[in-house]
Every structure is written in structure tokens, then in C-alpha cells.
């Protein structure tokens, strides 16, 4: 038989109440932390460069295209021909094309293609810094001017297998494109 005196009972009750209060505070703090935890959204850069034809070109050089996908390949000639006719290769793409995120979300852009890309914020979509890849009549937009000699463009370059973090986007619409392959475009809506 257990005998508790009034002081011991009071002490036990007080400990239980204190423990319950601590648990409630901890749970509320955890829920608040989860609500305010920074979130991320991923964008993937894709391409289907053919290593044999891209790397054989003396202007590009060996090791440029590191495509390891099992999908179809596009030769360099095919890519240039499609761009010249205003029908860019859909294998070069950012996914998703449109993204809705909350303010405070960090974009993580991952290059899962075989060649370098940029993820450059632009005022409006337009031509990149390689005229041969621009649609007929499309001119290089200011944000892409100068290519990699422009530090602002160079900072947005992503190499095969690497990633780029884009934190702190303000509310509203943000447009991004690849300054090399200007048909690779993403619209990000920040709420």
C-alpha cells in the first residue's frame, strides 16, 4: 500500500503540471519552427547534348559535353539547325517552366544536363549571348550581354552536376533564362 502525505502529493502534482507545461511549450515551439523553417524549391536544367559531336568541335573542345543520360542525343549540327530555324530543341529545358513559391523560399537550380547553362534573372525574355543559338531576328538582351566576361552572367553559370542557390526573391514575378540557350526559360511567382 502506497501512502502519500499531503506535501508529497502536492510535490508530485506540481511536477506533473510543470512537465505538462514544458511539453506544451516544446510542441508549440516545434510547430512554430516548422512553419517558419526555410523552404527550398528545385529547378532542373536539362539538355541532350551528344558527347561525340559536341566534344569533337574544336571551338568547344573535348570534355565539354558530359551527358550521361540514357535518353536520345542531339548532335551539335541538329541543335544549331533547329535554333537557326526558330524551333529550338525541347530537350534543352528548365523544369518546371512555371513555379509558384512563398516568399523566403530558396531556389536550388541543378544542372542534370551534359553541358553548362546559366540561370540568369531577366527583365523580359530574349536572346542569349551566342547569336547562333538565338531565334531569327532575336537580339541579345542586356542581362546576357558580354557572356561570361560579364560577372553578373558568370555568377549564374551552372556546370554539369552542380547547383546554384537563388535565395531572397521578393514578392512578384521573376523571369529566368539561360543566356547560352535562351529558349530555356522559367517564370517564378513569389507570393
Spans of features found by a protein language model:
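Bacterial N-terminal signal peptides
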Residues: 10-21
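Extracytoplasmic copper-binding redox domains, predominantly the cupredoxin/blue-copper superfamily
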Residues: 25-191
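Bacterial N-terminal signal peptides that target proteins for export
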Residues: 2-11
